[in-house]
């Protein structure tokens, strides 16, 4: 085939992606994949030529400078030589003249004879200077030649590096040089024409964009070349690497630095994204994959945030949120010696059993008459002294709400509980409630049997009734003291105080008297004239006027202190209740009050606590509701089901409590944390919030104050009128806590009558359904002589030529077993399904 034929048969339009060409030798089709982007070798050559020209010009300039310096040195040498000659001439002229005699002509020629001798003497000096000049000139020329050679080598090396950079960048961008060895001149010419047309079309369509992109690429190449040249210049010397080992043809990929993430107890999704330097949507996507739906402002707990951060490749640092608080608390002087302190006593009991009368009598009898006169301000706590000089502090907490609130906040302010029971009335529902509160707080009980002056009083009946509630008197071998008293007539009051002191000696109550004080808030309110007022019971140390107090979310300097009688005091020791003025706000009952050194740090801690409380309130887990009990149990949050039972009659309460106790198993236990007769009160709601319990009301309702607490604390409250419904719902909740069971049920059986071979499915068993239904998507077993030889699933299920989803009893079908071809006549195919069996109590 001639060149003209090849040229005529050349394609009119060549694709830029794939080209096929036939070699002349063997006629094989060669597929060549090319890209339209090509390396601009002309630019590389131009850069090489410019570098070489620049180096040559620099060498010539240096040679010219050296030549000028040599000529200047030569001129200076000649000037010195002339000066020396002039000096010799002057010496000759200054010599004395020789007198000439008339007849002495031969002597007149003597100076002419001496002149050649002097010139001969000066010749060695000239020759030495000429030699020095020649040597200096030779050295300068040699140095210039060496410098020119070095510059030329450097220019060649730079050109070679530019070429290498261009080649490596071409390799990085996936660009390939055209291999012209296997391409004819006609194909190359057609390629170039097609490339020119494509470039022209592209330039018309997206000229501005392409120019910008081209400019960006050129700028990038120049920046990379400059950066590498700078590295090469720095690397020259003894330790400089040679060849391409020093070159990097691509920019080293920048690895994203996974910063350490510091996570507190709670954090919002936006804050976590900011710390991880990612978009919040990435965190939301990650949590969606983990099964959690969150918003950008949602607060998540520390454990969840840790899982998300580790999932996204970050190292997590868990921070204790109380570092600042701990630092402030550690800077306290609490190393003083402990001394015995007075007991703190709370009097509890049924409303009508004389609790208030007993408190009033003790106060009137044991407080000095001068202090007791007039109107005294009742602050909820006061202390009295016995005849032998010992002191007792009484807390007057209306009802049991404040007492339960203290327990809910972890503050144990009470040492001893005095349980007041009327001798004529016996044990009442609120009496039982008081016993439950005392046990929850871990405080010992002293029983005061009141109203013994009445004719119908029966103290023995009280002891027997309390025995049923595990309050065993000393008479029956227990450790609970029973003291008969009469608040109206003042009988047995001293015996009661003595019993309290005896119990305190058993407890061995001690506290630090000297040093910075700490205590608990009994109650607080906002006074119009005095501002926030808090009653603080000092538990250790001494509270002085002017101290800086950190009290829950509030702080402040003690501006004034008053005792229970309204008298100004300057200090208060352990077990002394005082009114404190000067706080920034009204603290909550049960908050811990602590004296600190620095008011600024106290303010920081108070503000931190406020923010933390808001976050924890948003992020706290959902309360134990019946609907979510199963999920809570699977997560390991609930170990037992706490219940508070309130009913209309005592019989119903006992029946419900007994039935609930019988429902308990080894896996799930029901714990009745409170029970009683009557409507649901605020006390019950507070106890439920503290114990994380479910409230059950049987034929009773909650009052307004209780409903407010229930709504605020998100407590689960259920009303029932039929006891079976109550027990069934509790059973359902407990059953949800149990681990589910799975059971296999056989739904169909088919007998193999014949076996066929199919090119696609392999062995096809012609079967007759003998029992139940054979379903296409259910797991199966192959039985041979009632022995399971294979367990798997169906590949196909057909009736005649139609694919079906199920075949019923008495019908024929073709069954293909997936991944099993050893089906034989007489085998049985058993179809079953896995059913979850819910466990029940």
Swiss-Prot record:
Gene3D superfamilies: P-loop containing nucleotide triphosphate hydrolases, Translation factors, Translation initiation factor IF- 2, domain 3. GTP binds at residues 349-356, 396-400, 450-453. CDD domains: IF2_eIF5B, IF2_mtIF2_II, mtIF2_IVc. Residues 450-453 are annotated as: G4. The keyword Nucleus does not apply. Residues 1-12, 52-92, 114-170, 188-202, 213-235 have a biased composition (Basic and acidic residues). It is found in: Cytoplasm. Residues 1-24, 52-246 are annotated as: Disordered. Residues 486-488 are annotated as: G5. Keywords: Cytoplasm, GTP-binding, Initiation factor, Nucleotide-binding, Protein biosynthesis. Residues 340-510 form the tr-type G domain. GO terms for cellular component: cytosol. Residues 396-399 are annotated as: G3. Coiled coil: none annotated. Belongs to the TRAFAC class translation factor GTPase superfamily. Classic translation factor GTPase family. IF-2 subfamily. One of the essential components for the initiation of protein synthesis. Protects formylmethionyl-tRNA from spontaneous hydrolysis and promotes its binding to the 30S ribosomal subunits. Also involved in the hydrolysis of GTP during the formation of the 70S ribosomal complex. This is Translation initiation factor IF-2. It comes from Actinobacillus pleuropneumoniae serotype 5b (strain L20). The gene is infB.
């Amino acid at each position: 085939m001639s060149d003209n034929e090849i040229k005529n048969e050349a394609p009119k339009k060549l694709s830029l992606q794939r080209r096929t060409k036939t070699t002349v030798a063997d006629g094989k089709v060669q597929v060549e994949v090319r890209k339209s982007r090509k390396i601009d070798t002309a630019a590389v050559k131009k850069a090489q030529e410019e570098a070489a020209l620049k180096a040559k010009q620099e060498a010539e300039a240096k040679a010219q400078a050296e030549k000028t310096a040599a000529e200047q040195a030569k001129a200076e040498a000649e000037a010195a030589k002339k000066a020396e000659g002039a000096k010799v001439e002057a010496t000759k002229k200054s010599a004395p003249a020789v007198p000439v005699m008339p007849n002495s002509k031969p002597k007149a020629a003597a100076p002419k004879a001496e002149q050649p001798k002097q010139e001969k003497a000066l010749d060695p000096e000239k020759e030495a200077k000429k030699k020095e000049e020649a040597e200096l000139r030779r050295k300068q020329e040699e140095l210039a030649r060496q410098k020119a050679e070095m510059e030329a080598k450097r220019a060649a090396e730079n050109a070679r590096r530019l070429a290498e950079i261009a080649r490596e960048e071409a390799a990085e961008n996936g660009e390939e040089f055209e291999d012209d060895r296997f391409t004819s001149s006609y194909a190359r010419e057609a390629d170039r024409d097609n490339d020119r047309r494509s470039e022209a079309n592209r330039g018309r369509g997206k000229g501005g964009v392409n120019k910008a992109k081209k400019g960006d690429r050129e700028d990038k190449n120049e920046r990379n070349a400059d950066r590498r040249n700078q590295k090469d210049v720095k690397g020259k010397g003894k330790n400089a690497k040679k060849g391409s080992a020093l070159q990097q043809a691509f920019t080293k990929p920048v690895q994203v630095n996974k910063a350490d993430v510091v996570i507190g107890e709670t954090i919002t999704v936006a804050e976590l994204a900011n710390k991880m330097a990612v978009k919040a949507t990435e965190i939301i996507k990650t949590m969606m994959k983990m099964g959690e739906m969150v918003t950008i402002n949602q607060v998540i707990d520390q454990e969840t945030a840790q899982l998300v951060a580790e999932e996204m490749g970050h190292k997590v640092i868990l921070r204790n949120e109380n570092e600042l608080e701990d630092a402030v608390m550690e800077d306290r002087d609490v190393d003083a010696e402990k001394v015995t302190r007075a007991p703190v006593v709370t009097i509890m009991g049924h409303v009508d059993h004389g609790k208030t009368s007993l408190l009033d009598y003790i106060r009137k009898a044991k407080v000095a008459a001068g202090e007791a006169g007039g109107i005294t301000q009742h602050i909820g706590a006061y202390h009295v002294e016995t005849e032998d000089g010992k002191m007792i502090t009484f807390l007057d907490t209306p009802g049991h709400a404040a007492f339960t609130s203290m327990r809910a906040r972890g503050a144990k302010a009470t040492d001893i509980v005095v349980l007041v029971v009327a001798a004529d009335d016996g044990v009442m529902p609120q009496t039982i409630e008081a016993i439950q509160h005392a046990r929850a707080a871990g405080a010992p009980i002293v029983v005061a049997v009141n109203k013994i002056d009445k004719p119908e009083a029966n103290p023995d009946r009280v002891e027997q009734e309390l025995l049923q509630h595990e309050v065993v008197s000393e008479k029956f071998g227990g450790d609970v003291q029973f003291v008969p008293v009469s608040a109206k007539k003042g009988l047995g009051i001293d015996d009661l105080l003595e019993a309290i002191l005896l119990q305190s000696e058993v407890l061995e109550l001690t506290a630090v008297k000297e040093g910075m004080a700490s205590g608990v808030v009994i109650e607080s309110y906002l006074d119009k004239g005095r501002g926030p007022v808090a009653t603080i019971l000092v538990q250790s140390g001494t509270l002085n006027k002017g101290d800086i107090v950190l009290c829950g979310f509030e702080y402040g300097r003690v501006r004034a202190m008053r005792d229970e009688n309204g008298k100004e005091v300057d200090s208060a020791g352990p077990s002394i209740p005082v009114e404190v003025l000067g706080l920034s706000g009204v603290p909550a009952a049960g908050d811990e009050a602590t004296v600190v050194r620095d008011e600024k740090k106290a303010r920081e801690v108070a503000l931190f606590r406020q923010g933390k409380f808001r976050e924890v309130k948003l992020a706290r887990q959902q309360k134990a509701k019946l609907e979510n009990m199963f999920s809570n149990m699977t997560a390991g949050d609930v170990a037992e089901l706490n219940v508070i039972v309130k009913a209309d009659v005592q019989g119903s309460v006992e029946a419900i409590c007994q039935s609930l106790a019988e429902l308990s198993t080894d896996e799930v236990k029901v714990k009745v944390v409170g029970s009683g007769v009557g409507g649901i009160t605020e006390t019950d709601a507070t106890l439920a919030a503290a114990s994380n319990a479910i409230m059950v009301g049987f034929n009773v309702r909650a009052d307004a104050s209780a409903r407010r607490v229930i709504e605020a604390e998100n407590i689960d409250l259920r009303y029932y009128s039929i006891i079976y419904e109550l027990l069934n719902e509790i059973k359902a909740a407990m059953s949800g806590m149990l681990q589910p069971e799975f059971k296999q049920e056989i739904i169909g059986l088919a007998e193999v009558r014949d076996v066929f071979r199919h090119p696609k499915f392999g062995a096809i068993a012609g079967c007759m359904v003998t029992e139940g239904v054979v379903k296409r998507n259910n797991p199966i077993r192959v039985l041979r002589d009632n022995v399971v030889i294979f367990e798997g699933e169906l590949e196909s299920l057909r009736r005649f030529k139609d694919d079906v989803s199920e075949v019923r009893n008495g019908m024929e079908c073709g069954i293909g077993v997936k991944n099993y071809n050893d089906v034989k006549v007489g085998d049985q195919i058993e179809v079953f399904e896995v059913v979850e069996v819910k466990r029940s109590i």
